From Swiss-Prot:
It catalyses: 3-O-(alpha-L-fucosyl)-L-threonyl-[EGF-like domain protein] + UDP-N-acetyl-alpha-D-glucosamine = 3-O-(N-acetyl-beta-D-glucosaminyl-(1->3)-alpha-L-fucosyl)-L-threonyl-[EGF-like domain protein] + UDP + H(+); 3-O-(alpha-L-fucosyl)-L-seryl-[EGF-like domain protein] + UDP-N-acetyl-alpha-D-glucosamine = 3-O-(N-acetyl-beta-D-glucosaminyl-(1->3)-alpha-L-fucosyl)-L-seryl-[EGF-like domain protein] + UDP + H(+). Its EC number is 2.4.1.222. The active site is at D261. GO terms for cellular component: Golgi membrane. The keyword Disulfide bond applies. Its cofactor is Mn(2+). Glycans are attached at N214. The lineage of its organism: Eukaryota, Metazoa, Chordata, Craniata, Vertebrata. Keywords: Developmental protein, Disulfide bond, Glycoprotein, Glycosyltransferase, Golgi apparatus, Manganese, Membrane, Metal-binding, Signal-anchor, Transferase, Transmembrane, Transmembrane helix. Residues 55-74 have a biased composition (Basic and acidic residues). It comes from Danio rerio. It is found in: Golgi apparatus membrane. The gene is mfng. The keyword Endoplasmic reticulum does not apply. This is Beta-1,3-N-acetylglucosaminyltransferase manic fringe.
Amino acid sequence: MILRRLFHVLPAFAFTLFILVLLDLQLRTRSDQKPQNAHDGHQRTTFISETTAENQHRDGAHEKEKAEGQKWTEVRSTPPLELSDIFIAVKTTGRFHKSRLALLLETWISETKEHTYIFTDSPDADISSEGFNVVVTNCSPEHSHQALSCKMAAEYDYFMASYKKWLCHVDDDNYLNPGALLSLLMAFPADGDIYVGKPSLDRPMRAQELLEGNKTRDVHFWFATGGAGFCLSRNLAERMAPWASGPRFEQTSAVIMLPDDCTVGFIVERRLGISMIHSNMFHSHLENLLLLSPSDIPKQVTLSYGWFESKMNSVELKGVFTKDEDPSRFRTVHCLLYPTTSWCPVALKSALSWNQHVMH
């Protein structure tokens, strides 16, 4: 009887024991899984942090690109160069007022009157009364390097006292094309150290620089001949001040015993270590002007003329005026650039100007 009861109770006991063991195993398994879950949570947190960092980096890069874009836009939005930004200096002397200078006043200076300054050694009531900017210097009328440097010093000081961005120098036997000048200067950075012109030599200038104790040393440098014209940016002109402002320009000229245009090249290349930019758009009477083709003439910044071996050295252009009427060819050039000028032939007034041809 007892044995029979035992057989009835034993299965229930075994089943209960099995349930307890199973529960214990499940609890142990969950306990073992907790660190792994915590590790997974850490991984998720790390991933979220890394993702956030990546997003922040991406956003930062985007903001940097945006800022750079704005900076580029600001650079690109610099107002375009205008004729009013250029200080055009013409060097002359009293004995050429009625000849060389009169031709310039009649032609290209009539188009740039407000921005052109005439540096001379003699007062001229007739020219001043017509509203031209005449600067009468205290310089000698002689064609010596001291007298020439005296006038260049005046040009430099007057430019530095202005608000203008460029100083462009020409002589009284140059024709200046304002449109070509603007096209040239606009190709340069607004804040650059620019010295552009044309050398009269095919090699650097060689000179003797005077040193203390009556010693000298050989120096060589490129310079833009004043007879073809040249331009200086304001940034560069400001850097030239220790050797060019006030009486210093003439003092520097005396150190190398050379005229004004050589002195400019000496200051820029030797004192500042900046190279001159050579341009074939400037022309002096020292070159063969007949080699310029008519189609290229409207693209040139300056032209010139002069006598060479009893022959007139000027550009070759047919029509408008004869060579006897216009030996320099400046009037012919001017009428082709500005056909509506009052004294130009009537036949030209309905034609496209050279300027319009070039722009189109």
